[in-house]
Amino acid sequence: MSLRKIIHIDMDAFYASVELREQPHLKGRPVVVAWEGARSVICAASYEARQFGLHSAMSVATVKRLCPQAVYVPPHFDLYRQVSAQIHAVFRRYTDLIEPLSLDEAYLDVTRNFKNIPYAGEVAKEIRAAIFAETGLTASAGIAPNKFLAKIASDWRKPNGQFVLPPHKVMAFLETLPLGKIPGAGKVTLKKMQSLGMRTAGDLRRFERGELLNHFGRYGYRLYDLARGTDEHPVKAERERLQISTEITLPEDLPLGQAAGHLPHLAEDLWRQITRKNVEAQSVTLKLKTYDFRIITRTLTYSSVLPDCAALLQAAQMLMARVPPQTEDAFRLIGIGVGRLVPKNQQQDLWA
């Protein structure tokens, strides 16, 4: 078992919490972050809203049925990025091995941290306290020997808590861990696991690698390792990007049509980034991740730059139409990105 000290930091209901910080009169009410419209999906739900069964990626139509009193707040992605930058500034006081997963979560390798604190749990406690002091927002943390276990642990004491999983307790922890807690184990995978008599990671561990490959394809390799608490993937420090992108991990696996409901707000977010960086783009890429971690990408390249957000959304929707609507596929992530970047005004303002 690795002796690394990995922290997974996950902000609590991040988008909704930022909005509640800005509009404190809404505290205690079921708040959802979304553009109000019958065809929209929500970006986030406050903990009060979650008590009604609301969650991100749910359609506004469903929200209205489950919680007619929900308060709708439009998303402010520039503000979320600003707050995320504050949070990352806190991380950098302790380590430069930071792997962002999104605006509101990241892995940190604190095995050798700048403050020479021997206990990763103390590092996590200090980081969470600093985040709260500087942003007014709470974070949860999981501390473990690898990324897989740290991510599971961060969900254990949510919200505003942390859970330390030391190496000598990993096997006992996994023995009773519900399979639904395994990252990437969506509805399709879980249904197959249950049909094989699996209920916990301990049950999964009793299957040989070949059996798992037979039942789950190449995802079986990953399952075999995860059932034994093994994950050698390093924390990858953020590198300068050659493209600009935005994506969302869905709280549950969704069919293609429902996943496509996220394209409008993803396009809005991405266009804000393009505008802020003062660049223009000539290619658009759609990214989808299936329940079994297969990556599907589609790309369009134009002879001139994208003129506006509507053109970006249209391109993303065209790419979505190129994905075969395989009914057995469920998607757990959707994202769009732009490439072939040039400084603004360098290209002719034409749309091909």
From Swiss-Prot:
It catalyses: DNA(n) + a 2'-deoxyribonucleoside 5'-triphosphate = DNA(n+1) + diphosphate. Monomer. The record marks Y15 as: Substrate discrimination. The gene is dinB. Coiled coil: none annotated. It comes from the Bacteria. It is found in: Cytoplasm. GO terms for cellular component: cytosol. Belongs to the DNA polymerase type-Y family. Pfam families: IMS, IMS_C, IMS_HHH_1. Poorly processive, error-prone DNA polymerase involved in untargeted mutagenesis. Copies undamaged DNA at stalled replication forks, which arise in vivo from mismatched or misaligned primer ends. These misaligned primers can be extended by PolIV. Exhibits no 3'-5' exonuclease (proofreading) activity. May be involved in translesional synthesis, in conjunction with the beta clamp from PolIII. One of its GO terms (biological process) is error-prone translesion synthesis. The active site is at E105. Its EC number is 2.7.7.7. Its cofactor is Mg(2+). The keyword Nucleotidyltransferase applies. One of its GO terms (molecular function) is magnesium ion binding. Residues 6-186 form the UmuC domain. Binds 2 magnesium ions per subunit. The keyword DNA repair applies. It comes from Neisseria gonorrhoeae (strain ATCC 700825 / FA 1090). This is DNA polymerase IV. Keywords: Cytoplasm, DNA damage, DNA repair, DNA replication, DNA-binding, DNA-directed DNA polymerase, Magnesium, Metal-binding, Mutator protein, Nucleotidyltransferase, Transferase. Mg(2+) binds at D10, D104. SUPFAM superfamilies: DNA/RNA polymerases, Lesion bypass DNA polymerase (Y-family), little finger domain.
